[in-house]
Design a protein with these regions (language model features):
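Glycine-rich nucleotide/cofactor/substrate-binding loop typically near the N-terminus or early
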Residues: 53-83
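Short secondary-structure boundary/capping segments
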Residues: 51-53, 134-140, 186-187, 214-218
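Conserved catalytic network of the ASCE P-loop NTPase/AAA+ motor domain
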Residues: 29-30, 50-52, 111-114, 161-165, ...
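C-terminal lobe/tail of nucleotide-utilizing enzymes
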Residues: 1, 162-166, 174-243
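Walker A/P-loop NTP-binding active-site region of P-loop NTPases
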Residues: 7-65, 133-137
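Pre-Walker A (Motif I) flank of P-loop NTPase domains
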Residues: 2-6
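Phosphate/Mg2+-binding loops and adjacent switch elements
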Residues: 80-178, 182-185
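Conserved nucleotide-binding/hydrolysis micro-motifs of P-loop NTPases
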Residues: 41-44, 62-65, 125-128, 175-179, ...
Length: 243
């Protein structure tokens, strides 16, 4: 389809990582150069499977990118500032927003790799991802306002995420109330941010199995209302995966 950036998003435990890996493997088989990464601190990526298939694998380690960002700021500041001024810089670097900026910039650098390869991003659970999207919008507005010294990857980030020809978000859920409601909220936030989402995946569907267990059959029956809800939210662009 020509997409350069593919996200898997949704609640924790719905199968985002597995799906992201499967997408990366399929793209590789189709001849694409693929970079698979995760923003999830839990980091469940199967590195061996991906690397053996020729996929570049990485993760955004928050502690690592924070230290790298601090060192970059210190290095630049030391070129022009006095020791007294550097104390103020160190105080600023202790601010919680420093970590947000560091993670955001690392995220922008990963997405920028779409210049040369297809980037598949396994995201952290919904709340963490929404904070990242909000940071993207805020940072973009600040860049436009100040015209400051900003990395090209940051300047290009939001336009790229909003470009339907380049970016696709696959919302992943389970056929249950809480995951579907969280996914619906995520869809609304993506729409507010102007980021394209067409496809949904409903994982672990008992209703697609031939179970004869009475409890599981009752659970499978209860799934149908949530599968119908996803069909409506996705306008029919939903894939179901059996348990």
């Amino acid at each position: 389809s020509g997409k350069r950036v593919v996200f898997t998003m949704g609640k924790g435990g719905v199968g985002k990582t597995t799906l992201a890996t499967e997408i990366a493997l399929k793209l590789t088989k189709l001849g694409a150069k693929v970079h698979l990464t995760t923003t999830d601190p839990a980091n469940h990526l199967n590195y061996n499977l991906a690397v053996q298939a020729g996929i570049t694998v990485s993760r955004i380690d928050e502690a690592e990118v924070l230290e790298a960002y601090k060192n970059e700021v210190r290095s630049k500041a030391a070129e022009t500032m006095t020791a007294e001024d550097m104390e103020y810089i160190e105080e600023d670097l202790r601010s919680p927003c420093t970590q947000e900026i560091a993670v955001f910039r690392a995220f922008a650098e990963i997405v920028d790799k779409a210049e040369n390869e297809v980037v598949v991003i396994d995201t952290a659970p919904t709340g963490h991802t929404l904070l990242l999207l909000d940071a993207t919008e805020s940072y973009h507005k600040e860049v436009q306002r100040t015209h400051g010294d900003t990395p090209a990857s940051v300047r290009k980030l939001l336009p790229r995420l909003r470009n339907q020809q380049e970016t696709e978000v696959v919302i992943v859920t389970l056929p249950e109330a809480t995951p579907v409601f969280e996914a619906e909220r995520l869809q609304m936030d993506l729409q507010r941010a102007g980021i394209n989402n067409k496809w949904w995946v409903v994982n672990a569907c008992l209703s697609l199995t031939d179970t004869e267990n009475s409890f599981l059959r009752a659970k499978a029956q209860n799934e149908l209302i949530w599968i119908k809800k996803v069909e409506e939210l996705s306008k029919g662009n939903a894939a179901l995966i059996a348990w």
